[in-house]
Design a protein with these regions (language model features):
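Hydrophobic helical h-region of N-terminal Sec-dependent signal peptides
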Residues: 13-17
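Heptad-repeat alpha-helical coiled-coil/4-helix-bundle sensor or tether segments in soluble regions
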Residues: 127-133
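N-terminal signal peptide c-region/cleavage motif recognized by signal peptidases
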Residues: 20-23
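Boundary of Sec targeting at the N-terminus
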Residues: 26-27
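Structural signal for well-ordered, non-membrane alpha-helices
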Residues: 103-106, 110, 133, 137, ...
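C-terminal amphipathic alpha-helix
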Residues: 30-98, 136-197
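Short, solvent-exposed, charged loop/turn and helix-capping segments
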Residues: 102-127, 141-145, 175-180
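Bacterial N-terminal signal peptides that target proteins for export
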Residues: 1-12
Length: 197
């Protein structure tokens, strides 16, 4: 026996509600807990992205949510590796974990659908991640050869990555001039926390 028209409408409505709920959950990749890894701390006043991303147009929210979730994970991986390099202890395994993490994050970021107009920001973020990977490979080698942190911070790619993150911040400011302070500050501090300087 076929369902009545009323039953079919209710079933369709229920399915649409389920799909909408699933879609919203899938779009929110940002973690609820942003605590830094044990024994590390963020170098700036990092706060979680505000839920719903006030001030970010709806068409950009999924991209911004996914991007900043990845930037947070890259920052956490950076903190663990930087601690190992500073302490000159456990560098190789920390470098291997960092490489695996950031390569995966960069690959996912590179395959993300980029809203029109955000392409230069995307290029800066991916460029900064690549430069930081080069920086950390060189930094690990320097520390393992007995060099100090002054030599590590002299590695050119670290400054170049910093410049790309500053450019990324400028692009975000230009795109969202009317965003509220909580959104602006959180986005700024995500880029600041990933930076090396």
């Amino acid at each position: 026996m076929a369902p009545s028209a009323s039953e079919a409408r209710r079933a369709t409505a229920a399915l649409l509600l389920l799909l909408a709920a699933t879609s919203g959950a899938a779009q929110d990749a940002y973690p609820t807990d942003i605590t830094p890894p044990p024994g590390t701390r963020y170098p700036c006043a990092l706060t979680a992205l505000p839920r719903g991303l006030p001030g970010i147009p709806e068409g950009d929210r999924s991209y911004v949510n996914h991007t900043y979730a990845r930037l947070l994970r890259a920052t956490q991986a950076k903190l663990v590796l930087l601690k190992a390099i500073e302490e000159a202890r456990g560098i190789e395994p920390a470098l291997a974990r960092y490489r695996d993490t950031t390569r995966g994050l960069a690959a996912r970021q590179g395959s993300e659908a980029v809203p029109v107009g955000i392409e230069p920001f995307q290029a800066d973020v991916l460029g900064a991640l690549e430069l930081q990977q080069i920086f950390f490979a060189k930094a690990a080698a320097l520390r393992q050869s007995g060099r100090g942190m002054d030599a590590v911070y002299g590695v050119r790619e670290g400054r170049e990555a910093s410049a790309r993150l500053i450019a990324a911040w400028s692009r975000m400011q230009g795109r969202y001039p009317g965003w509220p302070p909580a959104t602006r500050d959180s986005i700024y501090h995500h880029l600041c926390a990933l930076d090396l300087f």
